[in-house]
Amino acid sequence: RLDDPQRAVACAVEMQLAMTSVNERNRQAGYPEVALGIGINTGEVVMGNIGSQKRIKYAVVGRAVNLTARIESYTVGGQIFISESTLNDCGDILRIDSAMQVMPKGVKKPLTIHEVGGIGGDFRLFLPPKKEITWIELKHGLPVQFTVVDWKHTGELGHGGAITRIAHNMVEIHSEVLPSPLANLRISLYDPDDHEISDDLYGKVVAHLSESPPAFLVHFTSLPPEAETCLTKFLGAALN
């Protein structure tokens, strides 16, 4: 259908809006909150039953599918990113909150991806405005070790640093190195006495603050309960 790109974006917005009720049920049941990052692309694909008589599945394959996965990998929870082709096919009914250039693997030229905040027309679905981030300064930084995650491969925890500011699902880290923008990190968190709290935090570099000394912002994509408890404790202590 000609309006497939528009319906896909509308579906993505509805999914994000539905996360409020999903997480409300999770809280009532004692489960952790979850978040979605959604990537959308438009292009030609091969679709159908693929396999043999022993094993067969209905699948979608092709370069457009691979690029969609790459676009999704740049998101953090709550975001919807679309490609230029999807933007062009949707027309001017989209609310675009931001755009950035990326260089995914397997692509020869930089691509512009767009963050969707809503869709008008017959759909009239919009995400709420983003809340202003409230940062809390820490008197004493929390030590961390981190490494860059290259898709499914994780290296050794080799880079040291310290968390100097905390916000909801975000931290500011000062370190000896400056990871690339949008790099995925695995982080080990320590208390002020250098006792390990967790070595299983994951986050994405969402902004560079300084090159010398290196400082950057990380948006958490996975936060174990023990790490969340620690950060919430320091956040609450700073507010009090």
Q: Model-derived features: where do they sit?
A:
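Alpha-helical scaffold within the catalytic cores of cyclic-nucleotide enzymes
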Residues: 1-38, 42, 63-64, 68-76, ...
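A short glycine-enriched loop-to-beta-strand structural element that forms part of the catalytic core
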Residues: 32-48, 199-207
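A residue-level detector for short acidic-glycine micro-motifs
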Residues: 73, 165, 205-209, 222
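Cytosolic regulatory/linker segments at or just downstream of nucleotide-handling modules
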Residues: 77-149
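C-terminal output/interaction extensions
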Residues: 124, 128-134, 212-240
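Short strand-loop-strand
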Residues: 148-182, 186-189, 215-217
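Short coil-to-beta-strand transition motifs
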Residues: 155-158, 192-202
